[in-house]
């Protein structure tokens, strides 16, 4: 799942686990992060730019077609797949998280790393002093989506419908969705705010949005 919502949520959970934020993140050109890869002027996904501003980190996109500039992350994924997953079963996601946390702290983080020749947890203990502090108030993370107002004065997002003022029928608007709230914008101004629907087919309607 490389949706923007999942991408941002993974960042939040990682930063909370570390208890701090790296000052610079090297990012491969996944669409949930970089909408246009470019050597000199990459286009950052709008919601991800807001995340970076809220946490204070800098986004450093990898140059396209230059594998030498990428962070060495694939090897870590391969290590987890080969050493953690094969011999285990999980009741649910919470059980998986509890098991992997114990594995990192008692096994994976204490091994001698094949490249650095240092235990990963020892490296992290040294690096932690260089990290940024978490913000006192976590940023309100949300994803942006282009929407068009239907003739019934609603916009559609993830198979749910949200009303906007009837004068905007036919207009192209922007919708920002957080885990709890959906806000619709016209000309950079909010025109409607709704609690986020939880079921496909739900309608969130404000009577004042409808024509008299």
Residue ranges and their predicted role:
Residues 27, 38-39, 57-81, 94-96, ...:
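RNase H-like two-metal-ion nuclease catalytic core shared by retroviral integrases
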Residues 29-34:
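A short, flexible beta-alpha/helix-coil linker loop
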Residues 1-21, 198-204:
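Active-site beta-loop-alpha junctions of metal-dependent nucleic acid enzymes
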Residues 77-176:
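Active-site-proximal acidic segments at structured loop/helix or strand boundaries
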Residues 41-59:
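Two-metal-ion acidic nuclease core segments, chiefly of the RNase H-like superfamily
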Residues 7-11, 26, 48, 59:
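Extended, hydrophobic alpha-helical segments in both membrane/secreted and soluble proteins
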Residues 179-212:
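Protein C-terminal end segments and domain termini
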């Amino acid at each position: 799942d490389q949706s923007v919502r999942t991408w941002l949520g993974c960042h939040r959970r990682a930063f909370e686990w570390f208890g701090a934020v790296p000052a610079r993140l090297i990012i491969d050109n996944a669409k949930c992060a970089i909408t246009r890869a470019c050597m000199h002027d990459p286009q950052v996904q709008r919601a991800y730019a807001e995340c970076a501003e809220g946490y204070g980190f800098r986004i450093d996109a990898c140059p396209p077609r230059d594998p030498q500039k990428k962070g060495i992350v694939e090897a870590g994924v391969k290590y987890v797949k080969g050493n953690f997953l094969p011999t285990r079963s999980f009741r649910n996601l919470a059980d998986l998280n509890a098991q992997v946390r114990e594995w990192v702290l008692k096994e994976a983080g204490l091994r001698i790393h094949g490249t650095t020749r240092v235990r990963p947890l020892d490296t992290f203990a040294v690096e932690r002093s260089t990290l940024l502090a978490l913000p006192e108030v976590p940023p309100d993370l949300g994803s942006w989506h282009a929407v068009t107002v239907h003739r019934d004065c609603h916009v559609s997002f993830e198979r749910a419908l949200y009303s906007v003022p009837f004068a905007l029928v036919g207009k192209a608007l922007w919708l920002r969705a957080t885990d709890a709230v959906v806000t619709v914008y016209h000309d950079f101004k909010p025109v409607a705010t709704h609690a986020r629907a939880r079921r496909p087919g739900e309608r969130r309607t404000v009577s004042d949005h409808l024509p008299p």
